[in-house]
Amino acid sequence: LLNMTSVQDLLINIVIIGIIPGIGEELLFRGVIQKEISKKLINPHVAIFITAFLFSAFHFQVAGFIPKLMIGLVLGYAYFLSGSLILPMIIHSLNNIFLTTSLFAAGGKIQTQDIQSENVPIAAVLFSLILFATLTYLILSITKPNLQQNE
């Protein structure tokens, strides 16, 4: 049970749930795993998918597997296209901060089994798909000029 009853609780959770995992997980998944898999494979897209799959599995949420896989793909492409861990760290941290702040705004209490429920609302899946497509488009729009300069 995550319980946030004050702004102080929110700020502590933003650091513990938002910022620290956003940095640490990106160092591990993109900075080590994706980088090492990319060295061994010719196709970087396969390395990004494998890393996103591992990222999603790492979170141990059956119902959240697909949304976490999609954010893992966004983070993987953000790293691949920008060539820097800073962009995926920022995206990951902002995602976590958004979720933490949303929980606080909803009353600050949520039980873990609510998150892991097998009954995922179709609206949540559609929202995840739209968010994934939007973030992918934005990342490609931002990084495409940089890629063309590097060629």
Describe the predicted segments one by one.
Residues 52-57, 73-77:
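Alpha-helical transmembrane segments of multipass membrane proteins
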Residues 57-63:
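Membrane-interface helix caps and helix-loop-helix hairpins in membrane proteins
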Residues 24-50, 77-84:
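Membrane-interface helix/loop boundary segments of multi-pass membrane proteins
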Residues 20, 50-54, 70, 90, ...:
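Hydrophobic residues within alpha-helical transmembrane segments
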Residues 14-37, 134-144:
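Transmembrane alpha-helical segments in integral membrane proteins
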Residues 11, 15, 45-50, 65-66, ...:
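Hydrophobic alpha-helical transmembrane segments
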Residues 1-21, 151:
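Juxtamembrane helix-loop-helix connectors linking adjacent transmembrane helices
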Residues 93-151:
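C-terminal membrane module of polytopic membrane proteins
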